[in-house]
Curated annotation (Swiss-Prot):
<feature type="binding site">
    <location>
        <begin position="114"/>
        <end position="115"/>
    </location>
    <ligand>
        <name>substrate</name>
    </ligand>
</feature>
<dbReference type="GO" id="GO:0006094">
    <property type="term" value="P:gluconeogenesis"/>
</dbReference>
<feature type="binding site">
    <location>
        <begin position="183"/>
        <end position="184"/>
    </location>
    <ligand>
        <name>substrate</name>
    </ligand>
</feature>
<comment type="function">
    <text>Catalyzes the interconversion of 2-phosphoglycerate and 3-phosphoglycerate.</text>
</comment>
<dbReference type="InterPro" id="IPR005952">
    <property type="entry name" value="Phosphogly_mut1"/>
</dbReference>
<dbReference type="GO" id="GO:0004619">
    <property type="term" value="F:phosphoglycerate mutase activity"/>
</dbReference>
<protein>
    <recommendedName>
        <fullName>2,3-bisphosphoglycerate-dependent phosphoglycerate mutase</fullName>
        <ecNumber>5.4.2.11</ecNumber>
    </recommendedName>
</protein>
<feature type="binding site">
    <location>
        <begin position="21"/>
        <end position="22"/>
    </location>
    <ligand>
        <name>substrate</name>
    </ligand>
</feature>
<comment type="similarity">
    <text>Belongs to the phosphoglycerate mutase family. BPG-dependent PGAM subfamily.</text>
</comment>
<dbReference type="Pfam" id="PF00300">
    <property type="entry name" value="His_Phos_1"/>
</dbReference>
<keyword id="KW-0413">Isomerase</keyword>
<dbReference type="InterPro" id="IPR013078">
    <property type="entry name" value="His_Pase_superF_clade-1"/>
</dbReference>
<feature type="binding site">
    <location>
        <begin position="87"/>
        <end position="90"/>
    </location>
    <ligand>
        <name>substrate</name>
    </ligand>
</feature>
<dbReference type="InterPro" id="IPR029033">
    <property type="entry name" value="His_PPase_superfam"/>
</dbReference>
<dbReference type="InterPro" id="IPR001345">
    <property type="entry name" value="PG/BPGM_mutase_AS"/>
</dbReference>
<feature type="binding site">
    <location>
        <position position="60"/>
    </location>
    <ligand>
        <name>substrate</name>
    </ligand>
</feature>
<feature type="active site" description="Proton donor/acceptor">
    <location>
        <position position="87"/>
    </location>
</feature>
Length: 247
């Protein structure tokens, strides 16, 4: 049996402002920093000591991991970073206000773009101020892998190779693994772990800053579907807040 802990980054500045973020590298808000500290405290109180962290290339996830580890007294453990754990790329919606987008395009189109499994938003122009095409952190990424927009199915496809090639080997070695990532990269992983169908995944929301713990069997399937949040009541309240974004 092995232990996998999933932690969505704390509230970002753009989360607080109600903007679509995607691959834009915004920082944590003060509330998000406190959520990251809470995540670290919850890990310490539960006696969970990760041996290794996997995170994205975006500072809101990296800083969440760093703050949580500092709070738990585990700032020294190794951290591995990959673009495959980045947030879903929201295409031309990046930088746009969610409520205004909903008002402009209507509830149905808004929810299709936000929660449909296989329908991406319009692509982002390469000359957009929110484009990552000249970002040095992606300099070694083959151009054909650099997204201009993504649906959740795209995130699943890019995330799964990392699950098999990087995370599972750590779990197989007996390490407790913390994945500090994003709402949609974690939804993609939970979809795989819990074998959630393409339609039902639309109803899954991941709260910020509350560790979700999976105890895994020897074949890396969950012993309990859905795992367990270390603060179930706070998670329930935060999930409702995520669900209501853009209203």
């Amino acid at each position: 049996m092995s232990t996998l802990v999933l932690l969505r980054h704390g509230e970002s500045v753009w989360n607080a402002e109600g903007l679509f973020t995607g691959w834009v590298d915004v920082d944590l808000s003060p509330k998000g920093e406190e959520e990251a500290r809470r995540g670290g405290r919850l890990l310490a109180e539960a006696g969970i000591r990760p041996d290794v962290v996997h995170t994205s290339l975006l500072k809101r996830a990296i800083r969440t991991a760093n703050i949580a580890l500092e709070e738990a007294g585990l700032h020294w453990i190794p951290v591995k970073r990959s673009w495959r754990l980045n947030e879903r790329h929201y295409g031309a919606l990046q930088g746009k206000n969610k409520a205004q987008t909903r008002a402009e395009f209507g509830d149905e189109q808004f929810m299709i773009w936000r929660r449909s499994y296989d329908t991406p938003p319009p692509p982002l122009a390469e000359d957009s101020e929110f484009s990552q095409h000249n970002d040095p952190r992606y300099a070694t990424l083959p151009p054909e892998l650099m997204p201009r927009t993504e649906c959740l199915a795209d995130v699943v496809r890019r995330m799964l190779p990392y699950w098999y090639d990087a995370i599972i080997p750590d779990l197989a070695a007996g390490r407790t693994v913390l994945v500090a990532a994003h709402g949609n990269s974690l939804r993609a992983l939970v979809k795989h772990l819990d074998n959630i169908d393409d339609k039902s995944i639309a109803g899954l929301n991941i709260p910020t800053g509350i560790p979700l713990v999976y105890e895994l069997n020897d074949d890396f399937t969950p012993r309990k579907t859905g795992g367990e949040y270390l603060d179930p009541e706070a998670a329930k309240e935060a999930i409702e807040a995520v669900k209501n974004q853009g209203k």
